[in-house]
UniProtKB/Swiss-Prot annotation:
Top-level taxon of the source organism: Bacteria
Cofactor: Zn(2+)
EC number(s) reported in the record: 3.4.24.-
Recorded name of the encoding gene: htpX
Name of this chain's protein: Protease HtpX homolog
Compartments, record wording: Cell membrane
Protein family: Belongs to the peptidase M48B family.
Amino acid sequence: MLFDQIASNKRRTWLLLIAFFGLLALLGAAIGYLWLRSAVGGVLLALIIGAIYAGVMIFQSTEVVMAMNGAREVSEQEAPELYHIVQDMAMVAQIPMPRVYIVEDPSPNAFATGSKPENAAVAATTGILQIMNREELEGVIGHEVSHIRNYDIRISTIAVALASAITMLSSLAGRMMWFGGGRRSSNDRDNDSGLGIILLIVSLIAIVLAPLAATLVQLAISRQREFLADASSVELTRNPQGMINALLKLDRSEPMEHHVDDASAALYISDPKKEGGLKKLFYTHPPISERVERLRHM
C-alpha cells in the first residue's frame, strides 16, 4: 500500500508537469497566431522564456532562501537532537548530510531547500523543537529529507517558474492587445473565415484563462509532492503514527510570527500563514485532515 501510494503520487506529478508544458505551449501558440504569424514560433518563444525562468530560479542559492526566512545555520553542539535526527534520516535516505538551520519562531514548522541533495539544507523553527517528541520530529525531518531525495524542491521551482512565465506572457499579450491590437490585417486570408474566427476566439480565451489554469496546476503539483513526502517519511521512519501525531500538532498551531512570502510558504511542511476564507482554495498544501487520513490507510 505504501509503495503503491508513492508510485501513484509520482505518476500524477509527471502528468501535471506535462499539462503545465502543454498549457505554456498553448499560450505560446495563441500569441504566435495573433502577433508572430506563426503558432510554432510562439510555442518556441514561450518554451524558451519558461526555460529561462526555471533556470534562474533553480540556481537561486540555498543561503538566499534561508536568509529570506530568517534562518541561521547551527552546529551539532548548538542543536544536537535536531542535528542527529537530520543525520539519521539522511543516512537512511542515502543522501548527503544537509546543512541544518533554525528559525527563531514559536510556531512549529520546518522546511527544506536546495535544487539537489548536494546543496540542500533543512530548517526547523524553535517552536517545533519545543512541542514535538523525538518520534514526531523524526516524522517531520523524514518529510523534509524526502523532499530533498525526491527532488521536490526542483520540481516545485520549475512549476513556480512556469506559472510565472505564463502569467508574464499573458500580461504582455493583454497589453499588446490593448495598445496595439492583434495581427489581424486585410492580408490575412483567414480573417473572415469561420476557422479564422474560431482560432481568434480560442487564442483570446487561452490568453485570459492561462494564468488561472497555471496557478491551479502549480497548486496541484505542490499538493501531490506533500502527499508523496508524507508517504516517503513513513518509508524512512517505519512509524506512521509519529508522522500522524506531528501533523495533528501542526494543525493546532498558530501562524508564524516571521513574515513568510508566498514562494517560501510552499516550502514549509504546514502552511505558515493559515489564512482562511477563499484563500483556502489556493493553498499549496492539502488539508492536514486529508494527509492524516491517507497515512492511516497505509
